[in-house]
């Protein structure tokens, strides 16, 4: 018995040791599980709190709270919607009651909480005061998104020189009903004024006279810009910008998404600010609304390293005449000051001095050119030139416009679509990926988001419905008469050819270079020159 008992003792001890080891292992496992679950639980809690308002505030509530905090908006409002820091101070009635939100409740989300109504009232004390002038024949579907997008950026005044579709009563009455918009119609009286204007009687623009299509438009734009300078000065504007309705300002590099902020930071000795242009690069042939469907753009030469630009030139050009389909010399904004004059549609000048200009390193003009397949035929229909290589040189300044006009005038619909896909649409994913990585192409979503939010908020429909209900026919007709008769100064457009000889004989020789036309970006033949620089 003793012997048997002597051999059992180690067995009991071993069993006890095994049980203790198992308990220790179980404790360690539970501890590890607890340590794993704890941070996960905290992360989930933080996410829930942020989602319910514990983190970044809801845009609508941020807009409301900014009105009760620091005048001009709070830091929170800067963080959510840059450039809109003055919303609360703009209109005293903006936040009178919570029911004001219903004005924008056209969608399930508070997609555009910046203003309480479509009028976009702007505090007259805000500086700088910016105006845009344009010459257009477009419809409301293009003008309204373009205009209200720039209102979001801080533009307060628009001088619209309208003709064609834009001058029809159903469209012009809507435009005239919008605060800050001046509509100028192309009438006989306007043309007579412009025939007596200073720049019509000077030589620097004369090489563009009496030519059709793009040349005629270029002269009209310049004469309209001359008139707009006078209107801008009378309205107390600080800056004036000439922009087409297929172009949007992209204020990259500013502390806020705001053209006003961008220009506020410009040194006081600068007279002109140049925005290099980016060109839309469509990825489909069925685009209907470029402003909300196009997000890819080709960057300007000025915003690219020279070796990248010329190294990728062939892939970026895709057998087209130039790097860009159309112009590449950007647009500019000028300080409204004495002796200011246009220097073509892309630049400004001064009669008494050489303007001090700067070129922005990040901000750009987004040019939505040939972004719809229908742009081929619409441009063709506006021009009566013959579709020959010689005659198109008389009508168009840029090579791609000439080629597009010939195709649109001579090809079948199927051939036009095939040509459009080959020369305009970016369908090759590998090429796109390569150029995006190299920085030639870039994605820009901000304008798309802003305009889509405007559309969802009901801003555009509010403008149209308000104009329809509030403008009587009598008031509308009188407003047209007032718009055309109250302009006391400046210019009008193209005098008839009968007066050509008289006009030339009386023309003043101005010691200045010819007006700056739309120019293509540098080509490969200039690569050596730019590399040496």
Swiss-Prot record:
Keywords: Abscisic acid signaling pathway, Cell cycle, Cell division, Cell membrane, Cell wall, Cell wall biogenesis/degradation, Cytoplasm, Developmental protein, Differentiation, Glycoprotein, Glycosyltransferase, Growth regulation, Membrane, Secreted, Signal, Transferase. Induction: Down-regulated by light in a phytochrome A-dependent manner, via protein destabilization and subsequent degradation by the 26S proteasome (at protein level). Reduced transcription in light conditions in a HY5-dependent manner. One of its GO terms (molecular function) is glycosyltransferase activity. Residues 1-22, 86-108, 485-504, 512-533 are annotated as: Disordered. Its main location: secreted. The keyword Membrane applies. Its EC number is 2.4.1.-. Glycans are attached at residues 24, 201, 470, 484. Disulfide bonds: none annotated. Expressed at low levels in both light- and dark-grown plants. Accumulates especially in the elongation zone of roots (at protein level). Expressed in the roots regardless of the light treatment, high levels in the uppermost regions of hypocotyls in darkness, but low levels in light-grown hypocotyls. GO terms for biological process: abscisic acid-activated signaling pathway; cell differentiation; cell division; cellular response to light stimulus; cellulose biosynthetic process; cellulose microfibril organization; developmental growth involved in morphogenesis; maintenance of root meristem identity. 'Kobito' means 'dwarf' in Japanese. Involved in the coordination between cell elongation and cellulose synthesis by promoting the expression of genes involved in cell elongation and cellulose synthesis. Acts as a regulator of plasmodesmatal permeability. Mediates abscisic acid (ABA) and sugar responses essential for growth (e.g. seed germination, stomatal regulation and ABA-regulated gene expression). Required for normal organogenesis by promoting cell elongation, regulating cell differentiation in vascular tissues and maintaining root meristem identity. Belongs to the glycosyltransferase 92 family. PANTHER family: GLYCOSYLTRANSFERASE-LIKE KOBITO 1. This is Glycosyltransferase-like KOBITO 1.
């Amino acid at each position: 018995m003793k012997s048997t008992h002597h051999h059992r003792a180690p067995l009991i001890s071993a069993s006890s040791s095994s049980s203790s080891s198992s308990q220790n292992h179980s404790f360690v496992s539970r501890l590890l599980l607890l340590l794993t679950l704890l941070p996960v639980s905290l992360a989930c809690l933080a996410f829930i709190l942020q989602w319910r308002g514990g983190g970044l505030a809801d845009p609508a509530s941020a807009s409301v709270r900014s009105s009760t905090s620091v005048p001009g908006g709070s830091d929170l409002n800067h963080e959510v919607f840059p450039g809109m820091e003055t919303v609360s101070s703009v209109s005293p009635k903006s936040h009178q009651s919570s029911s004001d939100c219903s004005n924008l409740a056209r969608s399930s989300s508070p997609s555009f909480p910046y203003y309480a109504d479509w009028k976009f009232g702007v505090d007259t004390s805000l500086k700088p005061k910016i105006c845009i002038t344009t010459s257009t024949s477009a419809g409301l579907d293009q003008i309204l998104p373009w205009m209200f997008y720039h209102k979001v950026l801080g533009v307060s005044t628009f001088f619209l020189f309208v003709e064609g579709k834009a001058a029809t009563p159903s469209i012009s009455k809507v435009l005239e009903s919008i605060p800050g918009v001046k509509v100028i119609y192309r009438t006989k009286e306007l043309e007579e004024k412009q025939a007596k204007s200073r720049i019509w009687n000077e030589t620097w623009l004369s090489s563009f006279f009496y030519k059709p299509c793009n040349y005629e438009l270029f002269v009209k734009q310049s004469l309209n810009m001359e008139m707009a300078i006078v209107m801008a000065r009378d309205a107390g504007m600080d800056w004036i910008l000439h922009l087409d309705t297929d172009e949007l300002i992209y204020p990259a590099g500013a502390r806020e998404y705001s053209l006003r902020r961008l220009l506020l930071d410009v040194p006081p000795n600068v007279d002109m600010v140049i925005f290099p242009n980016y060109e839309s690069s469509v990825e489909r042939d069925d685009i209907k609304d470029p402003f909300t469907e196009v997000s890819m753009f080709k960057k300007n030469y000025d915003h690219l390293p020279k070796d990248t630009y010329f190294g990728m030139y062939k892939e970026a050009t895709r057998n087209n005449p130039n790097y860009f389909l159309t112009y590449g010399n950007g647009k500019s904004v000028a300080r409204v000051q004495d002796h200011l004059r246009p220097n073509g549609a892309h630049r400004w000048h001064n009669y008494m001095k050489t303007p001090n200009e700067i070129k922005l390193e990040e901000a750009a003009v987004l040019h939505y050119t040939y972004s719809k397949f229908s742009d081929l035929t619409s441009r063709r229909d506006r021009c009566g030139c013959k579709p020959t290589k010689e005659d198109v040189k008389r009508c168009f300044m840029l090579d791609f416009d000439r080629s597009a006009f010939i195709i649109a005038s001579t090809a079948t619909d199927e051939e036009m679509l095939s040509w459009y896909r080959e020369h305009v649409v970016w369908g090759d994913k590998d090429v796109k990926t390569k150029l995006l990585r190299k920085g030639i192409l870039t994605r820009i979503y901000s304008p798309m988001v802003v305009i889509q939010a405007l559309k969802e908020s009901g801003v555009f429909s509010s403008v149209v419905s308000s104009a329809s209900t509030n403008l009587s026919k009598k008031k509308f007709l009188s407003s047209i008469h007032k718009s055309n008769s109250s302009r006391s100064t400046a210019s009008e457009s193209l005098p008839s050819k009968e007066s050509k000889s008289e006009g030339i004989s009386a023309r003043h020789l101005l010691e200045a270079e010819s007006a700056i036309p739309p120019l293509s970006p540098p080509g490969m033949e200039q690569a050596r020159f730019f590399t040496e620089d």
